Amino acid sequence: MIALWSSLHAAFISQFFMELNMHGIRYFVLRNYEGLPETNSGKDVDVVIAPGTYHKVTGILKGIMQNFNIYYFQISKFETMRCWYIMDDAQHFAIHIDIIENEVYKGFQYFDFEYLYANVIPYKDFYVLNKTMDTVLLLAQNIIAYKRLKDKYRRTITQNYLQSNE
C-alpha cells in the first residue's frame, strides 16, 4: 500500500514527537525534516534515540497506534536500526519510521549518541542535529557505508557548508 502524506500522518508523527518529549526520551530526527509534521519530502522518518530507550519507544508507538485505531505493523531490524512499517488499509495510512539507537555500520560506530546529541537543536516541536553536525554525519555515513557520495547528498552538503559560512 502506498499512502501519500496526509493530515493523519501529520497527527501521528506529531503525537509521536510529543510523547517522546513528554517521556523525556532524548532523540533527534535525521534529514528531510523541514516539512514535518505537515509534509514529508522523504520516504520515511529517521529518528535517532538514546541507547537503552528502545523498549520505551516501542510502548509509545504501540500506544499511539491504538489511539489512531491502527493495529498492523511490521519491524525489520538491521544492527541498531529498527524499521517500523505501520499501516491501516481502511484509513489509507502507511508510515515508515526508522528508529536508530546508534549510528553503526557493519559493527563500526562512527559517532557516539552523546557526541551527536550535544549538537541537537529544537526545530518546531521536535529535535534535529544542527546543520554543521548534520553535514558531518551525512558525509561520514556516505563515505563509510557507500564508499561514495550520492549526488543528492553532495548538493545538501554543499548548501549546508555555504550556509554555515555566511
Residue ranges and their predicted role:
Residues 1-43, 49-166:
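Conserved NTP-donor binding/palm subdomain of two-metal-ion nucleotidyltransferases/polymerases, i.e.
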